[in-house]
Amino acid sequence: MTTKRKPYVRPMTSTWWKKLPFYRFYMVREGTAVPTVWFSIVLIYGLFALKHGADSWAGYIGFLQNPVVVILNLITLAAALLHTKTWFELAPKAANVIIKGEKMGPEPVIKGLWVVTAVVTVVILFVALFW
């Protein structure tokens, strides 16, 4: 049976998400995927340059030294750090850690993840620079 009643459809503008800070931040966080695509393209370009010899690699290094590319890479780094921060803040909500019958707060988990990230970064830099 069909009805002739018209259901109420609440009007919604295309900028509805700009009104609440939570949704604005959500859109910024999801927007961090765009700089990640840039970084992926730069890495693929570097792999092809490495494959094609020393002259191509020198051209790639020159490309990386371009001030515009440096600025884009700094923006990408900031976006990656923001994305990492938000994921580290979500981790304690996904894993309930219970010690001596009490649920552990989020701070130790978040700090632990940052410590692991820092240690792994230092080890990778050490291996890359001094090995």
Curated annotation (Swiss-Prot):
Membrane topology annotation: Multi-pass membrane protein
Subcellular localization(s) per the UniProt record: Cell inner membrane
UniProt GO MF annotations: succinate dehydrogenase activity
Superkingdom of origin organism: Bacteria
Alphabetized CDD domains for the sequence: QFR_TypeD_subunitC (cd00546)
Main location: membrane
One Pfam family recorded for the sequence: Fumarate_red_C
Residues that span the membrane, as ranges: 30-50, 61-81, 110-130
Keyword line: Cell inner membrane, Cell membrane, Membrane, Transmembrane, Transmembrane helix
Gene Ontology CC entries for this record: fumarate reductase complex; plasma membrane
UniProt similarity note: Belongs to the FrdC family.
Assembly: Part of an enzyme complex containing four subunits: a flavoprotein (FrdA), an iron-sulfur protein (FrdB), and two hydrophobic anchor proteins (FrdC and FrdD).
Function: Two distinct, membrane-bound, FAD-containing enzymes are responsible for the catalysis of fumarate and succinate interconversion; fumarate reductase is used in anaerobic growth, and succinate dehydrogenase is used in aerobic growth. Anchors the catalytic components of the fumarate reductase complex to the cell inner membrane, binds quinones.
Protein name: Fumarate reductase subunit C
Species of origin: Klebsiella pneumoniae subsp. pneumoniae (strain ATCC 700721 / MGH 78578)
